């Protein structure tokens, strides 16, 4: 059974309200869904005889600050039975909570913690939603586009005090001027 058959069959079989948009490409197929139907769609893709996407490869997040629902959460699935991959995407904002899928894919707990830690997207009734990649005292979510590149605090080891200290970051340069003009566009017309 080829990838296109699985995709076409899934699309024809699924309730249309579950899927907002589909995309077929050489890099893999994609379903966009609403957060309300995420769990049902994942159940279908995992358990149906002609899909069998039983491996959750990854859950990752993307931040689009200009969108109303700025966070996109992407579920990458693999069907080892049919050698096929599919991406499932849903959107959320700071207050929208996404369905927990640990009951379907036990490894999802780790991925959901990572998405929460890096982006601040929360999951409904997650049993252990705490930081996984950043320090427990870390403030903010570092993969958000509005997170400052230098962070909020500096963590360093203080040798005289023999302990780790956190201090607010002090920028030595308060004002910077960025010249975005290309030096190639400023060339004299006489050169040549």
Curated annotation (Swiss-Prot):
Oxidoreductase listed as a keyword: yes
Membrane topology: Peripheral membrane protein
GO molecular function, one term: NADH dehydrogenase (ubiquinone) activity
EC number: 7.1.1.2
Enzyme class (EC, first level): translocase
InterPro entries: NADH_DH_suC (IPR010218), NADH_quin_OxRdtase_su_C/D-like (IPR037232), NADH_UbQ_OxRdtase_30kDa_su (IPR001268), NADH_UbQ_OxRdtase_CS (IPR020396)
Location within or outside the cell: Mitochondrion inner membrane
Predominant subcellular localization, coarse grouping: mitochondrion
Keyword entries, A-Z: Electron transport, Membrane, Mitochondrion, Mitochondrion inner membrane, NAD, Oxidoreductase, Respiratory chain, Translocase, Transport, Ubiquinone
Family matches, as Pfam families: Complex1_30kDa
Gene3D superfamilies: NADH:ubiquinone oxidoreductase, 30kDa subunit
A single Gene Ontology CC term: mitochondrial inner membrane
Superkingdom as given in the UniProt entry: Eukaryota
Catalytic activity: a ubiquinone + NADH + 5 H(+)(in) = a ubiquinol + NAD(+) + 4 H(+)(out)
Keyword Translocase included in the entry's annotation: yes
HAMAP family the UniProt entry points to: NDH1_NuoC
UniProt similarity note: Belongs to the complex I 30 kDa subunit family.
Matches recorded under NCBIfam families: NuoC_fam (TIGR01961), PRK06074.1-5 (NF004733)
Quaternary assembly: Complex I is composed of about 45 different subunits. This is a component of the iron-sulfur (IP) fragment of the enzyme.
Protein task: Core subunit of the mitochondrial membrane respiratory chain NADH dehydrogenase (Complex I) that is believed to belong to the minimal assembly required for catalysis. Complex I functions in the transfer of electrons from NADH to the respiratory chain. The immediate electron acceptor for the enzyme is believed to be ubiquinone.
Protein name: NADH dehydrogenase [ubiquinone] iron-sulfur protein 3
Organism: Beta vulgaris (Sugar beet)
